From Swiss-Prot:
Gene3D superfamilies: P-loop containing nucleotide triphosphate hydrolases
Protein name: ATP-dependent RNA helicase sub2
Superkingdom, taxonomy of origin: Eukaryota
Compartment list: Nucleus
Amino acid sequence: MSHEEDLIDYSDEELQTTDAAATTATPAANGGQAKKDGELTVTGGRADKKGSYVGIHSTGFRDFLLKGELLRAITDCGFEHPSEVQQVCIPTAILNVDVLCQAKSGLGKTAVFVLTTLHQLEPVPGECSVLVMCHTRELAYQIKNEYARFSKYLPDVKTAVFYGGTPIQKDIEVLSNKDTFPNIIVGTPGRLNALVRDKKLSLRNVKAFVLDECDKMLDQIDMRRDVQEIFRATPTDKQVMMFSATLSQDVRPICKKFMRNPLEVYVDDDTKLTLHGLQQYYIKLSEAEKNRKLNELLDSLEFNQVIIFVKSTIRANELDKLLRECNFPSIAVHSGRYKEFKEFNKRICVATDVFGRGIDIERINLAINYDLPADADSYLHRVGRAGRFGTKGLSISFVSTPEDEQVLKDIEKRFEVALPEYPEEGVDSSTYMA
């Protein structure tokens, strides 16, 4: 496919045509049929020179035949067994096959593309081979840190992160010096497009093009336009991988316009809320009762770290101030301040939805929706902060308005669950504390 004919516009007619073509294409390894493995659905994987779908059920990362340096780093991180999504994606991804993957938060999607691209990478000084884009600076930093810990035994690999809101001249200085020029670039679409447009960044050597939380970028027209322009600046023959915790039927065909017969992996049916080990409850109360109830919960519940979600930056700052006045070790995180919380210097974090997607802090085992989100997908991303990688966790949502009650109904309908009311006697800590 040419960049021009497929990426200029997405009309309804185009999307229907693309979706029809994708669903009628015959995957290389399964005769055109979707492979169902419990609640995991796998389709596709092209049979051209980039390789074909490989089915493998691995019991350890060594089964993937990754570089020895990567295996050492994986061992250092304490990982013994790949998650379900890693078992399905990595063996095929390392063959340079395009990948479209939807899996709930905490199932190890980031490690799929980090390990795949590091395994394939042959670093050349002054050349960018891997380009990873995401929609927030927090997520960009987290991905960069994942590359850092898995590439600790690959000293020639250089990684940099670029995002808006900072002086672009600093980024230009990094790109102008061959000694600091990164082989792997992680960033947000707006800043990366500015660097490409001003000819400060050449993408002619990119071999892997990755979008994390792809639905967030491709849903928004401005961000999607930046992604398109960056995509056009990369070679035609490259691997494309896209990942998200939520991937609606409307967004999937848009994603596939960037790909060639991708391996499609959908872990758990996307109509079901399957955050294993996470206990979920709601509490009906008035707006005026929220602060008292929050204080009661923080006093009575055991937790390692808790994240409290509110609907605006102003409310985050106000609630954080109130909690600190009550001597709770709190910090407000809404656009970039999460290092102190991540390093366990603070146990309570008040956050907005910017923090709800992709941010992975392993000690969080309690999530409280002080303000319920506006939609079901945002609820999934929020409560997914607790109970990462299938560990235990607890989420409690405050329901105080008719709009909240409707969102609660939407959540139950969307994910086919019935959320119970929080019991008056509380809950046993053994049900949510690992």
